[in-house]
Amino acid sequence: MNTQGTGYDMATSTVEADTRAHIVAVADELFYARGIQSVGMDEIRTGAGVSLKKLYAAFPGKEQLVAAVLTGRHEYWEHGIEQAVAAAATPRDRLLAMYDFLEQWFSDDTFRGCGFINAFGELGSTSPTVARIAREHKESFQEYVAGLAAEVVPDRVAAEELAAQLALLAEGAQTTAAIAGDSAPATHARRAAATLIDAATRA
């Protein structure tokens, strides 16, 4: 999957890497549970157990911290999807394994939907950085699915169309599961994906 350079480059900070990572983890938990705009930097400072000076040395502004959180979520998503796909035996099963990952994720008590959609909903209209990161994350996933689809459908155009359909199922399942508080949308999406894959291979 494409590990594009989205987000904030933490290598430019003078604060220790472990401290930055801890701040990001605390911010991620708070942002994801309650929303970005409802959580202030002072609350993050308290949660991380660092001084306000150190917090701002690590992340000069909240937008940079949000970018770092989203970059971490992108990496987590990539790892989870790739791990599930790697365990599958056939090209068809590799496509369907994405939905197995979603079902496991949806079953987690902390699941609150797609962090990128959530962030875009809050800040996409006012933060070009957040909008770009969210867009690049979705484009990266689309490209990854297209690569998997090409193993099932040799025709490039047909593979890209199948990938667009399967990615849309995954995106819709995330939103539906978050609202319903239920992992069943992953199962429904997997069944629909199987139907689409089988239809594409018969064409």
Language-model-detected regions and their locations in the chain:
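Conserved acidic functional residues
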Residues: 15, 28, 118, 171
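Helix-turn-helix
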Residues: 11, 22, 26, 30-64, ...
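Hydrophobic alpha-helical connector segments
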Residues: 68, 82-110, 163
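Amphipathic C-terminal alpha-helical segment
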Residues: 105, 167-184, 196-203
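N-terminal intrinsically disordered/low-complexity leader segments
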Residues: 1-18, 201-203
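All-alpha amphipathic helical-bundle segments outside canonical DNA-binding/catalytic cores
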Residues: 132-133, 150-167, 184, 188
